[in-house]
A protein has these predicted regions:
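Metal-dependent catalytic neighborhoods of phosphoester/phosphodiester hydrolases
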Residues: 1-3, 80
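Histidine-acidic metal/acid-base catalytic patches
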Residues: 3, 10, 92, 100, ...
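Glycine-rich, aromatic-flanked loop segments that form ligand/cofactor-binding clefts
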Residues: 5-27
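Active-site acidic/histidine proton-transfer and metal-coordination neighborhood
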Residues: 11, 26-130, 215
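Hydrophobic residues within beta-strands of alpha/beta enzymes
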Residues: 17-19, 68, 160, 202-203
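Generic serine detector
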Residues: 18-21, 80, 104, 210
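Active-site loop/turn elements of alpha/beta-hydrolase fold enzymes
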Residues: 21, 72-73, 110, 162-165
């Protein structure tokens, strides 16, 4: 499958910037079950998630994709929390495997505050660990304003998900994802700030719905972002 993907990417001139690792399930994206089911934090799913990420690293190597990315989970804010130390060790295991495959590992923003993610990356202590900066997730999880988060995460931003969303108002559920330009992300200011920190990698449009509306929203977002980028 990796060889077929590589052939198709080359044939159609598509750049695959990362291979995304998800699952194994369950993964519940809310504020109650999320901490218990997402990423490398939950003990009962951790080994299976590590194995999945390692398998994705093998796939990325075989397909010529430079990075693996995924959610690490609701990383505890307290660095003395045993779950924090265990999660850092799990990230290190994944990142070491990626490094053997000459791939980077990107932690997707969302469930943790930016400074907690920086702390975890530094405690992992490997130079192939970075961030996939999902600007809407920071808002939808209520963790940060993405403009401010750039200041914290700048040295580690390797990829960017262009997505838009709203802050949560229901304490159980995430804020809503909305089409780019209809949410709280200030894309003109964000793109300018990314330029200032020297970010020149792709902006990957993400619209997590399906069907014709997804296609229409992605095309509209592409046109909007191209005008901003110039």
């Amino acid at each position: 499958m990796a060889a077929r993907l590589r052939k198709a990417l080359d044939q159609y001139g598509v750049e695959a910037t990362s291979a995304v690792s998800t699952g194994p399930k369950p993964e519940v994206y809310d504020f109650y079950q999320g901490p218990l089911t997402i990423g490398l934090v939950p003990r009962q799913y951790r080994q299976a998630r590590i194995a999945r990420m390692q398998a994705v690293a093998d796939f990325a190597r075989n397909a010529g994709i430079p990075a693996v990315q995924g959610h690490c989970g609701f990383i505890p804010e307290n660095p003395s929390d045993e779950l924090y130390r265990e999660t850092v060790a799990a990230i290190r295991t994944v990142a070491e495997y990626c490094r053997k495959n000459r791939r980077s590992f990107r932690c997707e923003t969302g469930q943790e505050t930016p400074i907690t993610l920086v702390r975890a990356i530094r405690d992992v202590g490997l130079d192939n660990v970075g961030v996939n900066f999902d600007v809407a997730n920071l808002i939808m999880y209520g963790k940060a304003n993405p403009l401010d988060a750039v200041d914290v995460l700048a040295p580690y931003i390797q990829g960017v998900h262009a997505k838009d969303g709203l802050y949560p108002t229901d304490p159980r559920n995430l804020g809503a994802e909305v089409p780019i330009g209809e949410g709280k992300v200030n894309f003109p200011a964000l793109i300018e700030k990314l330029r200032r920190i020297g970010y020149h990698n792709p902006l990957t449009i993400e619209r997590e719905i399906s069907g014709e509306k997804q296609r229409a929203d992605v095309l509209k977002a592409k046109a909007y972002l191209e005008k901003l980028i110039g």
